[in-house]
């Protein structure tokens, strides 16, 4: 070790001296003595590494308190940070899918602050069932006999198969053997549930006779899977649920359906693409239907199964149900969301998912044009800002081929360098509330469909 290195090491302050510095008092009050001491030890280790490797003091040596403040603030940030979603995907899986209605947020807050009647019957002063209140509500909305709630739709499909067809064959059209995000595949789920997959038909065409011919003494279910994240077009043929139910009745085999996204309203009345409705499948006689809570329904992540009382009872008594059950916060948010459907006249305003999906292209374009001048004043030296038409998507595997006309603010670098776009997008991701867009065709696009809090957005963008 050189004398110069020893001199540098000797300039490092003692932790006790730093702790008594007035600049550290507020940090100790806010973050606690233990956190601050642990951080200072790490900072001293970092400083020694810098001296050893560069023969200099660290850049932040002159202001230990400021460096400590920055590090503590960064460490205190939640792993689940709010962002401004301007990707053009409304139900963005990586960004948490459906935004919750104010009623759902308030219901969750109340459920977290006090004991609740999760599994307590006030009438009989005994144990109740956690799904009962929601089951009553779901039956009222869908026309089903009973309902069961688990933590997501993948769990719902697993439970549905394991409880009703373990050790038996499940007949599914080859064109419906879907894979969703995370390599979740229907054949894999069937194996985990103890079922044997019996494929029928071809990728593009399946007939009623294919189901009839597949049924044998070991058939447990006939299953329909809604291809919510892809579409097969052209020379195609499928068997609708109502026809499959008739086959099931004829052969005494229950019919179940995985609806995936699941919609409780006719989306076409809002000018949106039509999606199969739960009520239609229940009316057709499907024994069990599963769907997601956090997609088109607009609620929290949950798997919902509605259908025949006797088959729901099989699900409720299966050992997997306890492992997959939803917690009180999920149930509180889901109940509040479902209650919004009892007032359909106000649904498009109160349910954030539907409100965002139904925004008109004209209103989105007007919003983008209104903000353009202020953003150009901030970014115009490096980028050309334009308001351009674009197409939003619903996301989360919902209506995969359908797009929603929208408008975007685009940023094009004057020098044409793509690295400037990457740097700009990276800079926005470091904002206190990160702004997330997408880079495409030599531009950075900010689709304004999901922008509701303009003031927060402009505060971030003009920093």
From Swiss-Prot:
Q: Primary place of residence?
A: cytoplasm
Enzyme Commission number(s): 2.9.1.1
Give the highest taxon in the source lineage.
Bacteria
**Which cellular compartments is it found in?**
Cytoplasm
Its needed co-factors are: pyridoxal 5'-phosphate
Q: Name one Pfam family in it.
A: SelA
Q: Modified residue N6-(pyridoxal phosphate)lysine is at which positions?
A: 295
Pathway-wise, it operates in:
Aminoacyl-tRNA biosynthesis; selenocysteinyl-tRNA(Sec) biosynthesis; selenocysteinyl-tRNA(Sec) from L-seryl-tRNA(Sec) (bacterial route): step 1/1
SUPFAM superfamilies found in the cross-reference section: PLP-dependent transferases
Recorded GO CC terms: cytoplasm
**From its record, what is one biological process in GO terms?**
selenocysteine incorporation
For this UniProt entry, the molecular function terms from Gene Ontology, in alphabetical order, are: L-seryl-tRNA(Sec) selenium transferase activity
The record ties this protein, via InterPro entries, to:
PyrdxlP-dep_Trfase, PyrdxlP-dep_Trfase_major, SelA-like, SelA_trans, SelA_trans_N_dom
The reaction(s) this protein catalyses: L-seryl-tRNA(Sec) + selenophosphate + H(+) = L-selenocysteinyl-tRNA(Sec) + phosphate
Keyword field: Cytoplasm, Protein biosynthesis, Pyridoxal phosphate, Selenium, Transferase
How it assembles, according to the record, is: Homodecamer; pentamer of dimers. Binds only one seryl-tRNA(Sec) per dimer.
- Say which family it is in: Belongs to the SelA family.
NCBIfam families the record matches: selA
Q: What is the protein's given name? A: L-seryl-tRNA(Sec) selenium transferase
What taxonomic lineage is listed for the species of origin? Bacteria, Pseudomonadati, Pseudomonadota, Gammaproteobacteria, Enterobacterales
* Name of encoding gene: selA
């Amino acid at each position: 070790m050189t004398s110069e290195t020893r001199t540098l090491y000797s300039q490092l302050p003692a932790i006790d001296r730093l702790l008594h510095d007035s600049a550290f008092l507020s940090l100790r009050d806010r973050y606690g003595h233990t956190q601050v001491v642990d951080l200072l030890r790490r900072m001293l280790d970092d400083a020694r590494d810098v001296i050893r490797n560069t023969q200099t003091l660290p850049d932040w040596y002159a202001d230990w308190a400021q460096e400590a403040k920055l590090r503590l603030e960064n460490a205190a940030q939640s792993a689940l940070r709010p962002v401004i979603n301007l990707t053009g995907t409304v139900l963005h899986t990586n960004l948490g899918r459906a935004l919750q209605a104010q009623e759902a947020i308030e219901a969750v807050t109340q459920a977290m602050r006090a004991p609740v009647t999760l599994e307590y019957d006030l009438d009989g002063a005994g144990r109740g069932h956690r799904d009962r209140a929601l089951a009553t509500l779901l039956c009222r909305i869908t026309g089903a006999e009973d309902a069961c709630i688990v933590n997501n739709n993948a769990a719902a499909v697993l439970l549905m198969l394991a409880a009703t067809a373990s050790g038996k064959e499940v007949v599914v059209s080859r064109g419906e053997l879907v894979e969703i995000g995370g390599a979740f595949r229907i054949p894999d789920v069937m194996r985990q549930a103890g079922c044997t997959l019996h494929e029928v038909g071809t990728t593009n065409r399946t007939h009623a006779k294919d189901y009839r011919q597949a049924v044998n003494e070991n058939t447990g279910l006939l299953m329909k899977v809604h291809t919510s994240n892809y579409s097969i077009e052209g020379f195609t043929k499928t068997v609708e649920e109502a026809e499959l139910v008739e086959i099931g009745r004829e052969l005494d085999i229950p019919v179940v359906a995985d609806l995936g996204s699941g919609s409780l309203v006719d989306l076409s009345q809002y000018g949106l693409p039509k999606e199969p409705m739960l009520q239609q499948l229940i009316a057709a006689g499907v024994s069990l239907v599963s769907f997601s809570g956090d997609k088109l329904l607009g609620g929290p992540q949950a798997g919902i199964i509605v259908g025949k009382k006797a088959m729901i009872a099989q699900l409720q008594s299966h050992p997997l149900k306890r492992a997959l059950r939803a917690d009180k916060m999920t149930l509180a948010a889901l109940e509040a969301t479902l209650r919004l459907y009892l007032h359909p006249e106000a649904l498009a305003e109160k349910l954030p998912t539907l409100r965002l999906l139904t925004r008109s292209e004209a209103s989105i374009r007007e919003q983008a044009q209104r903000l353009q001048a202020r953003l150009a004043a901030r970014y115009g030296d490096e980028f050309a800002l334009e308001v351009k038409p674009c197409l939003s998507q619903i996301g989360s595997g919902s209506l995969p081929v359908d797009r929603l006309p929208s408008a975007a603010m685009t940023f094009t670098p004057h020098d044409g360098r793509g690295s400037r776009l990457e740097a700009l997008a990276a800079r926005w991701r470091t904002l206190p509330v990160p702004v997330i867009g997408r880079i495409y065709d030599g531009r950075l696009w900010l689709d304004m469909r999901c922008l509701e809090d303009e003031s927060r957005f402009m505060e971030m963008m003009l920093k």
